[in-house]
Structure formats: C-alpha cells, structure tokens
C-alpha cells in the first residue's frame, strides 16, 4: 500500500517581491535554501507545495471542534449539541455575524473555512504561477500532472467558498507582495474558471495505475469534483459525462463483497468493512476515490491532530448524572476499565466499546428515525447503528450497593414516564457507530484516533449522477443510480415513480453522514433551483433575485430539522436559523483590511448596504482576467 510520505514536511517560506531599485547589491537574495527561487525548480519542489494543500484540506475533519462540524449543523441532519457553553452556533441570527469570533477554542472553527481556503489557494497558485520555471524537457506528462493537481486544489477550495460565502475574492496568481485591493467576484464566473481548470486536470492528472499515490489527487478525484462543478453550473449533460468517467473507468466499483481485517467475522457486514479505518486505503477497496491519510508518524502536522470524531458525534452518555437509573442513581460512567469510581473499579468498559463523546454534532430526530424506511438497511441495524438502549448501566457503585439496574440496558424513562436523562439534547441520541468508531490504542478514554477518512467515495459519484438525471427529468436513470447505493446496503430498491430530489437527498444523508459537506451541497442545490426555476418536490419555485430571503436550503432545514422549525429551547439559546444564513458572512477582518478594494457582504449582515457590483472572470490568455461586469 502506497501512502503519501509527508513526514518532516518543510513548510515553505514565501518571499515577497523585490525592490524596483537597479543596484545589484539591493536586490533581495534568498536567505534560505528553501526559498521559492530554490525550491520550485523540479517536481519535488512543486509537490512540497501540493502536500501543503493536502495537509490543509485534511484539517477540515481532524482536531477538536473541526470546521466540518459547521457543515453538519447548518443543515437538516444535525445541530450543535454542547448545551453547557455560550457563544455556540444554536441561535444563528444572533451569533453568525461578520465581526463574531468564528475561530474560538472548542466553540467553533467555522472561521477556518475562510482562512484555510486562502492558505490552500496560496499554495496552489505558487505552483500554477511558477510551473514553467522548471525545465520539463521530456517530462511534459509530469508537468501537466502537477499543474492539474494544483488546479484541482484551487477549484476544490473555490467550489466550497462560493457555496458557503457566495461571491468571494478570486485570486489566480501567486501574490508576491502586500495587496489591499481585492474585489468580490461572481460565483458563476468563478465556477466557470474552475470547470475549465478541472477539464485540463481530468486530461492530465495521473490515475492510480499511472502512479498517483494513495492520499494524493488522482484522475477520478478530478472528475468527481468536476461533476459537482458541472451540476453547480447547471450543465447536467456534462455532469453525467464526468461522473461516467469515474463510474465506468474500469477501476472503481461499489464494494459489495466482504473485505479487509474483519471479512471473516460473521457479526459484521460490507457496510462495516467499508468504514473501518484500516480498510479504507486497501488496494481491494475499489470504492475509495480520494482519502485523507493520517497516521501517528505524521509528526510534522502535530501529533494531537487525530480524527476526534467520537468526541464530536457520539452522545455525552457518560457525563455525571446525565443518565440515571430508575432507582435514582448515576447510571453510566465513561471512565476506563479498572479506573475507580466512588471507590470501586469499572468492570464494564463502555468507553472502550463506544468512545467518549460530548454530543457536539447532535443528529436530528429525522436523521435518527424518520429518514430510515427499510428495516433491512444495514446502515441502520445493530451493530452498525447504535441506540442508547444498547448501552448498559456500568457505574460500579451500582454493583457494590446491590442495585438491580447494574448491567441492565439504559432507559430513557422510568415506569411512571419520568425522564431519566437530564440532558436529552446532548446525552441521548442514536448514532452510526460503524462510521464514527475510530480506535485510539494510546488513549484509555478514546474519542477518535489516527485514522484515514474518505474525502470522495464512489457511492457519492453515483448519487451525483442520479441528481444530474433528476434535473433532466430522467427518473428511470436516477432511480438506477440511487438503488445501486441503496441495495448494496440491503435496502429495497425504490420504484421509479417515487424518485425525486427529496428521495435523493434522503439517500445522501443515509450514505454520506459526516462525509459530505451537507450545508455546501444543500446550498448548491438551492442555487440550481433558483437558476432553473424548476418546481421543487415541496411544490415551490425559487428565483435568483430572492435567493437571500426565499431559498431551498432554508426550506429543507425547516422541513427536516425540528430544532430549527420549532425553535427548541436549550439552556442558553433557542435554536433558530433564517433564510439569509444560506450564505455565511464575509469576515469583517477581511473587509476592513482590504482598504484599496471592496469585498461585498452578504444579504442580512451589517455592511450589505455598501456593496458594489462584483467583478467577473473572463477567459483569455493564461489564467484569464478579472474584469468589471
């Protein structure tokens, strides 16, 4: 198995441009061997910048309170569940503001999307701008592979930015000196440039067979992203073609037979195999397209940056007094095996079996229950899927005092109907154990360890192609793709007559929970409804002119997410969203620092009234140009 070796990664020092003076002694000279002039002279130098792009992309999922949490809670599938904090993202209109601290400890990392995006763009643009500084004689394929990967990284970032923030600054070249003159650029033209770049990349980026390493960008990853961009542009035939380039490449196939470390264990199944971290990078896993690779040897990135996914998305089941027995005693503890609680050692190791969660990503009742329509669906069956009733009361004090509820299943209510869980938001919900359980042998209270994570997977490619067919009113083809994913999980196929966007989004939620950037994808679909004017499954039509006040993203969230629909009360806030939050606010810090240009603010936020017409990208020589509309 080949993995990207990014041990001891040398972070590059980007030199500023030199002075205009002509005296030779005033010309800046690199003070380091690793200055750009010395680094970007061959494939190894350019790949070092691309490795930095991969590293920054991985940061979305890894560490505590990863930015990805925001993609979950600004959607129909989940809400922020840490009820013991202030400043968290529950009452969205009150806290989602341009000058709010969006990168704050264990409260939120939403702001990382803006800063990390432009870091990745910086690294990609260095490669793009300097690619021909090297001698590529007899190495044209290597040059084009590297350039194509840089185009991929830049396009991937902008695909996310335009569905999080809308119109944003579009930077197409290496910035070699201070600049304060950026302007917002139209989402549509940014996507057009991304499409052009990805079409180049789809031609030249290597396949795995041609030498692409596990964890690096390959041709299939390019075509997968190109499919999303084609959808976003409303170019549905092109989306089908780019999805076909992955699905029909002869290499990638949905996994339907057991494989990996537990393939002979009859208590598990193909769904379990597919999501075990030790199986994701295996050669026989033909469903993997692009994988974030993580191991304890990657010390250059900080050993603490584990995939702390159980901490984020498993309930806070072991909190003190969170789940009481019918006899009124503390029922559960997340202390490890042998640790004393109340003077007695823990004998039932729940934390080792399920992980220590804090309930930050709290799935909605719809995701837990209403979404699932087939009892044979492996994704919603034990032991892949866990309910709180699968846990038992393990507090050793119960055993020591002869309490009859020791080792009995945890209960939500007592015989009289009284609640036994003191925090039903944070400490009581179901979860997809098969996907979220990532062991950490170095931690006796594991909350997620060093593990690989899917960035792109073939199941999503099928669902993207199904979506393109739906936009073209080809329900027969859409049903075939949805059912390919669905029947692999043991669920019955949908009849063609029942298939629509609601069904498609439901299947995405079942298959891609904590994989897809749910907010981004819902916003992309909202834009398509506004652009095409097609009638939605909810009976509504949408327009671009009213996007900030009436859009599909908001309607979908209100339809499926009872917390936002009913303004559920938490200890410090009510859960609320608003239509304009379909786009996040451009940070005030970015706007204020840009004193010689103008960054527009989105509707609904302070500063919107000072907006000016955004610029647009037009095709032309080199990277094209950013011009006034």
Task: Please provide the spans of the model-predicted regions.
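An aromatic- and glycine-enriched ligand-binding surface/loop that stacks and positions planar moieties
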Residues: 22-88, 230-405
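Conserved, well-structured interaction surfaces
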Residues: 38-51, 55-66, 84-165, 185-189, ...
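C-terminal substrate/ligand-recognition segments
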Residues: 351-485
């Amino acid at each position: 198995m080949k993995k990207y070796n990014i041990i001891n990664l040398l972070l590059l020092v980007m030199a500023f441009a030199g002075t205009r003076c002509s005296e030779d002694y005033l010309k800046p000279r690199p003070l380091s061997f690793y200055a750009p002039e010395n680094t970007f002279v061959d494939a190894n130098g350019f790949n070092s910048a691309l490795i930095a792009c991969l590293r920054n992309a991985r940061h979305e999922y890894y560490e505590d309170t990863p930015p990805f949490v925001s993609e979950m809670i600004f959607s129909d599938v989940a809400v922020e569940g840490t009820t013991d904090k202030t400043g968290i993202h529950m009452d969205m209109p009150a806290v989602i503001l341009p000058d709010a601290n969006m990168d704050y400890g264990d409260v939120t990392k939403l702001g990382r999307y803006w800063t990390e995006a432009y870091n990745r763009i910086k690294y990609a643009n260095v490669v793009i701008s300097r690619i021909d500084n090297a001698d590529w004689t007899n190495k044209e394929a290597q040059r084009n592979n590297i350039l194509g990967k840089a185009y991929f990284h830049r396009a991937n970032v902008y695909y996310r930015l335009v569905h999080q923030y809308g119109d944003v600054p579009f930077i197409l070249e290496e910035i070699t000196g201070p600049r304060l003159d950026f302007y917002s650029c139209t989402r549509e033209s940014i996507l057009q440039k991304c499409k052009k770049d990805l079409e180049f990349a789809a031609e030249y980026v290597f396949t795995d067979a041609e030498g692409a390493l596990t964890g690096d960008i390959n041709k299939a990853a390019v075509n997968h992203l190109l499919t999303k961009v084609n959808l976003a542009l409303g170019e549905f035939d092109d989306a089908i073609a780019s999805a076909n380039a992955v699905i029909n490449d002869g290499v990638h196939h949905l996994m339907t037979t057991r494989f990996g470390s537990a393939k002979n264990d009859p208590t598990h199944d193909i769904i379990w195999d597919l999501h075990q971290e030790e199986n994701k990078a295996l050669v026989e896993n033909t469903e993997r397209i692009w994988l974030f690779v993580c191991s304890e040897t990657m010390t250059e990135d900080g050993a603490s940056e584990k995939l702390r996914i159980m901490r984020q998305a498993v309930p806070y089941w072991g909190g003190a007094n969170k789940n009481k027995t019918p006899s009124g005693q503390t029922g559960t503890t997340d202390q490890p095996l042998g640790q004393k609680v109340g003077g007695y050692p823990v004998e039932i190791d729940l934390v080792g079996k399920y992980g220590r969660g804090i309930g930050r990503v709290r799935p909605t009742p719809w995701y837990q229950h209403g979404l699932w329509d087939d009892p044979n669906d492996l994704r919603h069956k034990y032991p892949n899927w866990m309910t709180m009733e699968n846990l038992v009361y393990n507090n050793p004090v119960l055993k020591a005092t002869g309490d009859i509820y020791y080792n009995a299943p945890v209960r939500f209510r007592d015989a009289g109907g009284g609640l036994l869980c003191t925090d039903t938001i944070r400490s009581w919900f179901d979860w997809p154990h098969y996907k979220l359980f990532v062991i950490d042998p170095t931690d006796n209270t594991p909350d997620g360890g060093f593990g690989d994570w899917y960035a792109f997977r073939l199941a999503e490619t099928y669902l993207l192609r199904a979506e393109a067919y739906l936009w073209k009113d080809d329900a027969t083809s859409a049903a075939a793709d949805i059912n390919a994913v669905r029947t692999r999980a043991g669920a019955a196929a949908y009849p063609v007559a029942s298939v629509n966007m609601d069904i498609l989004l439901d299947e995405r939620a079942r298959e891609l929970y904590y994989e897809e950037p749910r907010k981004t994808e819902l916003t992309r679909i909202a834009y398509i409804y506004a652009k095409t004017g097609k009638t939605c499954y909810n009976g509504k039509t949408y327009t671009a002119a009213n996007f900030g006040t009436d859009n599909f993203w908001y309607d979908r969230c209100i339809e499926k997410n009872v917390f936002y629909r009913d303004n559920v009360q938490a200890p410090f806030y009510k859960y609320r969203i608003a239509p304009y939050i379909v786009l996040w606010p451009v940070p005030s810090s970015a706007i204020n620092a840009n004193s010689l240009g103008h960054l527009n603010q989105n509707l609904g936020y302070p500063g919107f009234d000072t907006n000016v017409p955004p610029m647009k990208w037009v095709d032309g020589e080199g990277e094209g140009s950013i011009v006034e509309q």
